[in-house]
């Protein structure tokens, strides 16, 4: 459960990300593909090279979905329902991959905002990404 302090940290972080969401999303995807090569299996039709337009576009989708989630912290299941359906029923993404991408997102955010990435912010973002992952995998059951 996200506390009021967590929610404040999440909203403040998303405000700081601003127009860099797509860039950070793409960087996090690239990190995921490099560190966890099995994640590439879901993107056989993508050019996965550094700076690929397809990775950038998907990174923007990830960032946009997280921005929606950050704006609806009190009702993540409703905010992410369509995305949950897509990943569970059509794409059939292995749930572990959400955790891997979440880790790479945290690394990316820490790399770009080291001063703001305090232990409290880290914990709040980790809880947020875990909550998002839980919602995205909730329809697998």
UniProtKB/Swiss-Prot annotation:
Pfam family, one: Globin
Expression (tissue specificity): Red blood cells.
Gene3D superfamilies named in the record: Globins
GO cellular component annotations of the record: blood microparticle; haptoglobin-hemoglobin complex; hemoglobin complex
PTM-bearing positions, type Phosphoserine: 3, 49, 102, 124, 131, 138
InterPro entries named among the record's database cross-references: Globin (IPR000971), Globin-like_sf (IPR009050), Globin/Proto (IPR012292), Hemoglobin_a-typ (IPR002338), Hemoglobin_oxygen_transport (IPR050056), Hemoglobin_pi (IPR002339)
Modified residues (N6-acetyllysine): 16
Top-level taxon of origin: Eukaryota
Amino-acid positions noted as binding O2 in the UniProt annotation, renumbered to this chain: 58
Residues found modified as N6-succinyllysine: 7, 11, 16, 40
GO biological process entries: hydrogen peroxide catabolic process
Keywords assigned by UniProt, alphabetized: Acetylation, Heme, Iron, Metal-binding, Oxygen transport, Phosphoprotein, Transport
Keyword Heme (UniProt): yes
S-S bonds: none
UniProt-annotated binding residues for heme b: 87
Sites of Phosphothreonine modification: 108, 134, 137
Keyword field contains Metal-binding: yes
Subunit structure: Heterotetramer of two alpha chains and two beta chains.
Main function: Involved in oxygen transport from the lung to the various peripheral tissues.
UniProt similarity note: Belongs to the globin family.
Record's protein name: Hemoglobin subunit alpha
Species in which this protein is naturally found: Proteles cristata (Aardwolf)
